[in-house]
Amino acid sequence: MIPFSNPSASYQSHKSEIDSAIVHVLDSGWYVLGKEVEAFEKEFADFHGKSLHSVGVANGTDAIALCLKSLGLGLGDEIVTTSHTAVATIAGIEQAGCSPVFADINP
């Protein structure tokens, strides 16, 4: 097998910082929201320059639903997506009140 990536190498170079952050969060008891999430959202927005805000969400389904809702999309709107996707994609579309429309990928 040809290796696709080596996340362990990246982890090893930042191991002490990552481990310390994980222990800090676990010790605080704040797994959702909390100071670390707030700091991450601010740093993420700053990193992207023109972004005024960023919002951390629990998963990709919530991210898709919030993006669609922020665009004013909802009931009666159709979202074209690939038929070769995870169920979470469809869940996000339907959570926003939209209807998925499947399209084949044709290279």
Model-inferred region functions:
Residues 1-70, 74-75, 95:
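Conserved PLP-binding active-site segment in aminotransferase class I/II-type PLP enzymes
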Residues 69-107:
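PLP-dependent aminotransferase-like
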